[in-house]
Amino acid sequence: MLLKAKPVVEAIEKENSFILTPANKKYLNLAIVEVGSSDGSEGYISNIIKQCHKYNIGYQVHSFPEDVTEETVAKAVANISNNLSVSGCILMQPFPKGLNMESIKQFFSTSIDIDGTVKESIFSLLYPSMDCGYAPATAEACIRILKHYNIPLDGAHVVVIGRSMVVGKPVAMLLDKENATVTLCNSHTKNLQEITKSADIVIAALGKKNFLTKDYFSPNQTVIDVGFHCDEDGISGDVDKEVVDYVKNITPVPGGVGSVTTAVLINHLYKSANKTCILKGEA
């Protein structure tokens, strides 16, 4: 079965409708910071902007050339963080080499971190009582898809391929909270095919086009393909197309994780706007 994004997105949109009020609506303002550009990032930003137009969300895109100074980006991030009308900000990653992202993140307020970028947001995945920031949107999108389609997580063996702080590690933390048994694999993992074949669920987030062929899977598995590659051959994921008809469940590319990720970001923005409204005593 194809685990399509549309019904998951519709469920998130319904959730958003219960969050939105006349009081918090005025705080629905999003900032996007981009340094340099790529086809992937431009497409991602374009999708977010479409959603902003759809829901009448204010937005600003702060674009900088690759040779921008670290001081300039840090100053822009600090100004955004201090702007009380902004409830959400996305730092497009990765930054070009030469820019110290960790240094820039010091100026980024956790309260508007709707994509789980700063360390405090990641800590909150380990310590929910901290209640600061949000999970990285792509990692949360994977969980939302699995839950929407009633794929059992409690006790399931989930293999995550890729250990980035954007997807791999945070999705492993989220799965652990669901009582799944998680195996986190990377480029140094030995006997990867044996490991992936033994899983109930495989989450592919390695960033290599069509890398995972049918040889990596078993017929009764659920596969979440996070990869997104756009070139002259069209759009592909990390999982080869031949796997679609081989496994039990799989997310399509396109029309899978990416669309849900955008919906999750908007959901985080709604929640952040509501928190801002409450803090100002306007709820």
Where are these regions (language model features)?
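Positively charged, low-complexity intrinsically disordered leader regions
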Residues: 1-26
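Anion-binding alpha/beta catalytic cores of soluble intermediary-metabolism enzymes, centered on
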Residues: 2, 90-153
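Short beta-strand segments enriched in small/hydrophobic residues
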Residues: 27-37
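Glycine-rich phosphate/diphosphate-binding loop of Rossmann-like nucleotide-binding domains
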Residues: 35-49, 132-216, 221-222, 234-244
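Short beta-strand elements in bilobed, periplasmic/extracellular small-molecule ligand-binding domains
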Residues: 52-67, 182-184
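Short, well-structured alpha-helical segments in soluble
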Residues: 72-84
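Short glycine-/small-residue-rich Rossmann-like dinucleotide-binding loops
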Residues: 94, 206-208, 227-228
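Rossmann-fold NAD(P)-binding glycine/threonine-rich loop
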Residues: 104-122, 224-279
